[in-house]
């Protein structure tokens, strides 16, 4: 499974590079291969319950769809921009793993550029390094040999900005506008890749026990995994959404990107309405969310949604309206999309009108 996952990520990154920059030919293919395998070889040894290679793979794939959207919407990016961005995604959480730095020794783990260390108790997992993993990730990158004119300072700047919660005093000075934006897109990919993961609910217990190991569960007021689930909407609106608006714009530019947005909205909506939705209702929402992510034809998607909602509610007739904004007012206009459970002459006459 490990080999299959690694091979898939390599193939997907090469495919994205060639799609985005067909003139680049085989440039960076070897570096992509080496980077993915280096990342996977380290992360497969972690005993952190959540921050593993699967999480990094999801963040990297989400980041690719964000980058594709940026190129479509704004343009102005190069294959060099892409490779630095992608390496940052691959290695943003590598610092969770113990004994990866030259000065790491047994239980003593380096936590900053000054060489300070902490002792990781034998009963703890790699999650114990959560407060230091961003700094350790940058140190790991700097200890490796890189070729092909890779700008390590740029990659480390991207990784540095994945620190979360985002510090109120975070300042990005003396950096050009593109670097600032790319740095923020790496952060967005980290957040969306986690929260829009189709398997996020299944992984919540793993994330909770990482929090518990560092005491973050108490600081956040969580008494169990269920608290992470119920607090999802508040966490999203208060801490995540302010930092991902640009990335959402780019994701909405492609079908693959919209699937991330759809999953994100689905998770938020479900937790906001869980108290009033039955299990069947939750299943219907998931079905609709999946259809919206896959369907290219809007009318087909609208027919599908209307039919399923009417069947679920046992409504014999349903009609879709289109809301448009005219000046400062919204107007509702009828469409040709109908759901009719059983046709009768009266209903046909009504539809005709």
Identify the meaning behind each predicted range.
Residues 1-48:
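Non-catalytic interface/linker regions that flank or bridge core catalytic/transmembrane domains
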Residues 1-15, 19, 65-80, 91-102, ...:
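Divalent metal-dependent phosphate-bond-processing catalytic cores, especially two-metal-ion Mg2+/Mn2+ enzymes
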Residues 34-61, 119-126:
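Active-site flanking loop/helix segments enriched in acidic
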Residues 45-84:
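Alpha-helical phosphate/pyrophosphate-handling elements in metalloenzyme active cores
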Residues 48, 289-296, 305-314, 322-324:
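Short regulatory alpha-helical segment in sensory/regulatory domains of signaling proteins that mediates
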Residues 63, 127-169:
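Histidine- and acidic-residue-rich, metal-dependent catalytic cores
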Residues 178, 278-300, 311, 332:
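Signal-transmission linkers at sensory-effector interfaces
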Residues 307-310, 319-352:
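GAF sensory/regulatory domain recognition
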């Amino acid at each position: 499974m490990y080999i299959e996952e690694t091979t898939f990520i390599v193939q997907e990154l090469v495919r994205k590079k060639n799609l985005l920059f067909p003139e680049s030919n085989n440039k960076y293919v070897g570096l992509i291969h080496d980077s993915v395998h280096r990342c996977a070889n380290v992360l497969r040894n972690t005993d952190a319950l959540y921050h593993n290679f699967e999480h990094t793979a999801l963040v990297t794939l989400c980041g690719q769809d964000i980058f594709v959207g940026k190129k479509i919407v704004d343009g102005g990016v190069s294959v060099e921009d892409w490779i630095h961005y992608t390496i940052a995604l691959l290695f943003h959480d590598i610092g969770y793993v113990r004994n990866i730095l030259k000065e790491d020794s047994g239980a003593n783990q380096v936590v900053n550029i000054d060489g300070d260390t902490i002792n990781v108790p034998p009963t703890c997992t790699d999650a114990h390094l959560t407060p230091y993993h961003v700094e350790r990730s940058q140190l790991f990158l700097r200890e490796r040999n890189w070729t092909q004119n890779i700008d390590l300072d740029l990659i480390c700047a991207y990784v540095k900005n994945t620190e979360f919660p985002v510090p109120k005093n975070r300042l990005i000075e003396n950096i050009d506008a593109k670097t600032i934006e790319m740095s923020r897109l790496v952060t967005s990919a980290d957040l969306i890749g986690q929260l829009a993961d189709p398997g996020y609910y299944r992984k919540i217990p793993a994330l909770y026990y990482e929090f518990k190991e560092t005491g973050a569960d108490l600081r956040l007021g969580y008494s169990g995994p269920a608290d992470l689930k119920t607090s999802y909407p508040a966490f999203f609106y208060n801490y995540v959404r302010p930092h991902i608006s640009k990335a959402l714009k780019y994701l909405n530019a492609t079908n693959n990107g919209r699937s991330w947005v759809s999953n994100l909205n689905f998770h938020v909506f479900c937790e906001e309405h869980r108290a009033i939705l039955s299990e069947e209702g939750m299943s219907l929402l998931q079905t609709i969310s999946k259809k919206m992510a896959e369907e290219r034809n809007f009318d087909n998607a609208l027919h599908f949604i209307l039919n399923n909602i009417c069947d679920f509610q046992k409504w014999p007739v349903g009609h879709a309206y289109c809301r448009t904004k005219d000046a400062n007012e919204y107007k509702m206009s009828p469409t040709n999309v109908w759901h009719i459970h059983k046709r009768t002459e009266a209903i046909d006459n009504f539809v005709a009108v």
